[in-house]
Regions:
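Catalytic core of membrane glycerolipid acyltransferases/transacylases, capturing the structured
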Residues: 22-41, 54, 69-127
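Short gly/ser/thr-rich secondary-structure transition/capping motifs
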Residues: 54-62, 130-131, 188-190
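A transmembrane-helix-recognition feature enriched in membrane-embedded lipid enzymes
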Residues: 1-60, 112
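Soluble extracytoplasmic domains of inner/organellar membrane proteins
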Residues: 105, 122, 128-130, 136-146, ...
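Glycine-rich helix-loop-beta junction characteristic of Rossmann-like nucleotide cofactor-binding loops
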Residues: 64-68
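Residue-level preference for the first positions of well-ordered beta-strands
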Residues: 72-74, 146-150
């Protein structure tokens, strides 16, 4: 339980202390948007690595050499834990936005950070709004920003390896021609979800497959 409390406290403090940092980055972005974006990417990656350290999470990364570093891609992965985002974002070699459920927009501070990091919010129950999100993701990729989507549309809480993919999950790659990088995450649910609210130190394996040309 102590690990969970420490990780939560660190995350909250980071979000609060980071407010003036966001303001400074916003000013920098007026003159050099890329420099501001890269700075925020590295800051958040550092914070996520600290959270993983506090939680005692040990990572084995397989196939990271398959991830292109010179072009935007669409990451596609299975989704069993909130920690999937923390784990995979900490490994991104370039700017990457995540597609999150629409309800995340209501979370104070976190939604501000997510928006600044090019994350998008999707409402799958509203076809028009969902299409707007996909189009925004296409624009991100065209502007050199990778995107990550969990095509199951929600965390998989079943015994099945994966849930059916939601419609439109691959549209961003189809419309931009960017490579698709498949990710397989194993063991992440054992950090928290398997025994909520306790956090336990576990071994998580992340495997990146070879890029797929749509």
């Amino acid at each position: 339980m102590l690990r969970a409390i420490l990780a939560l406290l660190f995350a909250i403090l980071y979000l609060i202390i980071g407010i003036p940092v966001l303001f400074v980055e916003w000013i920098i972005g007026k003159f050099n948007r890329q420099a501001a974006d890269i700075s925020q990417l590295r800051m958040v990656q550092w914070a996520f690595r600290v959270i993983l350290f506090i939680c005692g999470t040990r990572l084995t990364i397989i196939g990271e050499e398959n991830v292109p570093k010179d072009q935007p891609v669409l990451y596609i992965g299975n989704h069993r834990s909130y920690f999937d985002i923390i784990i995979t974002y900490s490994r991104c070699p370039r700017l990457t936005g995540y597609v999150a459920k629409d309800s995340m927009k209501k979370v104070p501070l976190l939604s501000v950070w997510m928006t600044r990091l090019h994350c998008l919010f999707i409402n799958r129950s509203d076809v028009k709004e969902a299409l707007k999100t996909i189009l925004a993701g296409i624009d991100n990729i065209k502007n050199g920003i990778s995107m990550c989507i969990f095509p199951e549309g929600t965390r998989n809480k079943t015994e099945d390896l994966m849930l059916p993919f939601k419609e439109g999950s691959f549209k961003m790659a189809e419309k931009t021609g960017c490579l698709i990088v498949p990710m397989a995450i194993s063991g992440s649910a054992d950090i928290l979800e398997a025994h909520f609210p306790k956090v336990k130190p576990v071994h998580v394996i992340v495997e990146y497959g070879k890029p797929i040309d749509p």
